[in-house]
Amino acid sequence: MENSLKIKDIPKKERPKEKLLSYGADTLNNSELLAIILRTGTKGENVLQLSNRLLSKFQGLDGVLEASLDDITSIKGIKEGKASQILALAELFKRFRTFKSADRDIKIMSPNDLAMLINGEMSLLKQEILKVIFLNTKNIVIGTKDVFKGSLNTSIVHPREIFKEAVNKSSAKIIISHNHPSGDPTPSKEDINITLRIKECGEIMGIQLLDHIIIGKNGFISLKEKGFI
C-alpha cells in the first residue's frame, strides 16, 4: 500500500470530518463515520481504507460492533488503542438502546414495544441472557433484571429467582426475554418448556406472564403470538 492515498490528498470537502461538519452526520456512510471515530490510519493505509478493511473483515457495521478485543487486535495494524475506541463505541450503542427510563414511563402494549426497548442491546450479545421485565397493573415498566446467563434449560432456570424479584418489586405482571446468539430467534423445545413452567408458577403466585420474547440478530419472535402463552 505504499501508493495509498493519504487523507490530506483527498479534496477537503470529501474528507469525513469536513463532510460531517458541512452536510451533517446522516450524509456519511458507515466507513466515513467509523473513520471519524478511529481518527488515523495505519502505516501505508489511510483511515478510510482502514475503516473499509474492518467493515469487510467483520461483514458490516454490526460485525464490527460485536467484535471482541481479541477479534479486533488480530487485524494487522490494529493495536489496543484503536480497538478500545471501537469497543467504547459498541458499548455506547448498547447503553443508548438499553432501558434508561428515569424521566418517563414506558408502557408495553405489544411485542413490538418490548423489542424496541431491548432489541439493540440483546441482539449484539454473544452469550444467552434471560432478562425479566417487571410491570405494574397498567403495563408500565417498573424495572428489569438479568436473572440468568448461559444456555437455557429447565434444570437450571429456576422460577423462584424470577418471582422473588417480582414480589420485591410489587410487580403485577412480567415479561421474559432472551437472545439467541446464533441469530435465529426460532424457539427451541427448551424455550417452550421454560415458558410454560414460568407461566404455571405465575398463575400460582398471582403474577401474570404476558409474553416471552426471543431476540435474534435481525428480528424477534413472541411466544404469545405463537400461541404458547
UniProtKB/Swiss-Prot annotation:
Zn(2+) binds at H178, H180, D191. GO terms for molecular function: metal ion binding; metallopeptidase activity. Keywords: Hydrolase, Metal-binding, Metalloprotease, Protease, Zinc. Residues 107-229 form the MPN domain. Disulfide bonds: none annotated. Belongs to the UPF0758 family. This is UPF0758 protein CLL_A0562.
